[in-house]
């Protein structure tokens, strides 16, 4: 069963606009990945394929900064700090995963093993499980 938008907003801590932004980035990434995998864009590097995710992370960070400033102005300092910490933690872990995966795909180095690449995702899943228990 799929989650409702309200549940996603509560569990992830993202606003509806941010969720739409990340889903749009996933759609564009999927198209670029298909083009790269099928050989229609052989000159496109893996860094270019991941640009939608990097852009979505940057825009989400910008949006979070705006929301944090607004919450501080409204006097809700505790909520502002908690939201800022939570969103920046999620975005940082996601960004680290994307960077490590791009580096592995470009260089094919043996120093980057997949356990190391997936470790930010494992940490993120643990944090999301704790947050889901706290919210409900």
Swiss-Prot record:
Its main location: endoplasmic reticulum. GO terms for cellular component: endoplasmic reticulum; endoplasmic reticulum membrane; endoplasmic reticulum-Golgi intermediate compartment. It is a multi-pass membrane protein. One of its GO terms (biological process) is intracellular calcium ion homeostasis. The chain crosses the membrane at residues 14-34, 50-72, 81-101, 112-132. Keywords: Endoplasmic reticulum, Membrane, Transmembrane, Transmembrane helix. It is found in: Endoplasmic reticulum membrane; Endoplasmic reticulum-Golgi intermediate compartment. Involved in the regulation of cellular calcium homeotasis. May act as a regulator of STING-mediated inflammatory signaling in macrophages. PANTHER family: FAM11A, B PROTEIN, TRANSMEMBRANE PROTEIN 203. This is Transmembrane protein 203. It comes from Xenopus laevis (African clawed frog).
């Amino acid at each position: 069963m799929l989650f409702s938008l309200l549940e996603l907003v509560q569990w992830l801590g993202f606003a509806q606009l941010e969720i739409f932004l990340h889903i749009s980035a996933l759609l564009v990434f999927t198209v670029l990945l298909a083009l790269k995998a099928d050989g229609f864009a052989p000159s496109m590097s893996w860094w270019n394929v991941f640009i939608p995710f990097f852009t979505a992370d940057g825009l989400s960070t910008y949006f979070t900064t705006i929301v944090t400033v607004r919450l501080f102005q409204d006097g809700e300092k505790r909520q502002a700090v908690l939201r800022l910490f939570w969103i920046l933690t999620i975005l940082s872990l996601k960004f680290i995963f994307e960077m490590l995966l791009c580096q592995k795909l470009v260089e094919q180095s043996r120093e980057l093993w997949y356990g190391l690449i997936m470790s930010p995702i494992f940490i993120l899943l643990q944090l999301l499980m704790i947050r889901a228990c706290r919210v409900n």
